[in-house]
Amino acid sequence: APEVCAILSRESGALLGAVGLQPSSEIFPELSATEQREMGYWLGRPYWGHGVMTEAATELLRFGFEMLGLEAVWCSHYDWNSRSRRVIEKCGFRYQFTKETTNVIGMTNKTVFYALKKEEWLAFSGEKEFA
């Protein structure tokens, strides 16, 4: 089942966005869908550029690797979405490949895919190995 979290304002409790982990085996065929997840997110435009999504994504990765026992997480962004690219880079993901994709309304985009394995996350984040 997907794990989805609301991102709320610390001050007002207002909804700012959401971040989630969806079971998927698209990137690492050697891992089951329970060992890897796709990370997705959205953030309301007024909250862009304040580090909100990077903080939320970092905490979701910690949850995924520590609590769910994931071996890998992957994510993607359209090639024109530089803000999403920066979130992904700040979280330690590594580039995998780019391919053309078509969304649900029929728009074609170049989609850039990234992945992060547990051992890479541990090294990048400075977290200690967990039991």
Residues covered by each model-derived region:
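Acyl-donor (CoA/ACP) binding surface of acyl/acetyltransferases
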Residues: V4-A131
